[in-house]
Curated annotation (Swiss-Prot):
InterPro entries: Dual-sp_phosphatase_cat-dom, Dual_spec_Phospatases, Prot-tyrosine_phosphatase-like, Tyr_Pase_AS, Tyr_Pase_cat, Tyr_Pase_dom, TYR_PHOSPHATASE_DUAL_dom. Pfam families: DSPc. Keywords: Host cytoplasm, Host-virus interaction, Hydrolase, Inhibition of host innate immune response by virus, Inhibition of host interferon signaling pathway by virus, Inhibition of host STAT1 by virus, Interferon antiviral system evasion, Late protein, Protein phosphatase, Viral immunoevasion, Virion. It is an enzyme of class 3 (hydrolase). Transmembrane segments: none annotated. It catalyses: O-phospho-L-tyrosyl-[protein] + H2O = L-tyrosyl-[protein] + phosphate; O-phospho-L-seryl-[protein] + H2O = L-seryl-[protein] + phosphate. Serine/tyrosine phosphatase which down-regulates cellular antiviral response by dephosphorylating activated host STAT1 and blocking interferon (IFN)-stimulated innate immune responses. Dephosphorylates the OPG144 protein. One of its GO terms (molecular function) is protein serine/threonine phosphatase activity. Homodimer. This is Probable dual specificity protein phosphatase OPG106. Induction: Expressed in the late phase of the viral replicative cycle. It is found in: Virion; Host cytoplasm.
Amino acid sequence: MDKKSLYKYLLLRSTGDIHRAKSPTMMTRVTNNVYLGNYKNAMEAPSSEVKFKYILNLTMDKYSFTNSNINIIHVPMVDDTSTDISIYFDDITAFLSKCDQRNEPVLVHCAAGVNRSGAMILAYLMSKNKESSPMLYFLYVYHSMRDLRGAFVENPSFKRQIIEKYVIDKN
């Protein structure tokens, strides 16, 4: 087995169903200005203590708020194993980086706050990684977020795409 195949196998195996995932209900602060949540968190965003500048909506459903200064960016994604989410990695990670740098709070969400939004958050955190071991950093971030949220990027195809871009291609 070559090095890339070994890394991919180990990463996918170690992020399997270690404990039964449960749907997160609370919004999670990921960095100073980037938050991860679900649809309900997004609907409550206008009255949140956090004064969001943006909401990144990754569901298939488009919505808007009345009497709110929150800018909603809709990037429709399907949560299934055939969706190519890697086409969004560069644009979304760049956007989240700008929000962090400019101190503009952003909520990233999908329906449950697990797969689509979790994958974009994981891609963002991996894109910021300056560590010499992307494999270990991936495992650290994945398990830390899963411990915090109860479920995090459970879609194996989404994990695979992140591993290919941010771990395998870095080695």
